[in-house]
Amino acid sequence: MPFFPRKVLLLTECSLATLCFLVLAAMAWGQAADKTSPAPLSAAQIVDLMQRHNQARADNLKHYHSLRLYEVQYKGFPALAAKITVEADYDSAIGKSFRIVSQSGSKLLVDKVLKRLLETEREAGKDQKSTALTSANYTFRLDGTENMAGRPAYVLDVEPLVKSKLLYRGKIWVDAHDFAVAKIEAQPAQNPSFWISKTQIHHEYVKTDAFWLPQKNRSETKVRLGGTAVLTIDYGTYQVVPAAVVPEGGF
């Protein structure tokens, strides 16, 4: 077995803690939009509509399937990399399940980071209230509006009410028609370890039928002793089954 410096072993543990929330950050789902400027709503109104639309979409999502690609690279000494391809299934009755189709690269990163990340996502899905993007967990401040690929969006600053490794602070982009989170740029609310100096997360969502689901993620973690870990997730193309016929106007 090759020798791994202590900083690499620490990195695998710390990266896992930092990345736990990536899939918890939001499960936001929605419907269509136009290119006009969004209505002049307050932050409280936007958050209220987002929470109600999110709940309606969650209640109406019965099942989805996708083929995901997880990759992690440690740029330091020694340089390490690993990837896994995963079949992901969600069922409203039983939650999430994963099946690893293929894996390659560093066994240390596969076992200690990528596989544990899947297990964390599976377990965390059982209790989403403590990590959900709601007024129970965060404060919100309206920062303006932007167009994202022709779709108007509200930009909000978010601050967690408590320090937690599974919550974050940063900005969210809320689709102005669907009131679904379209993008997140953030950092963990609490540094998971002294050995980590900074973590930056970029998370994007895609509209699939009437639902908004994770599309891609990039998380970069800098280690105090030197080196950088980069995790990327490509969530693939979704096959979605709604629980009921979607209303013409969406959820």
Predicted regions and their residues:
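N-terminal secretory signal peptides that target proteins for export/translocation
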Residues: 1-12
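Intrinsically disordered, low-complexity and often Lys/Arg-enriched segments
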Residues: 2-4, 30-33
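Bacterial N-terminal signal peptides
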Residues: 13-26
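Structured extracytoplasmic
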Residues: 31-169, 176-181, 189-199, 206-213, ...
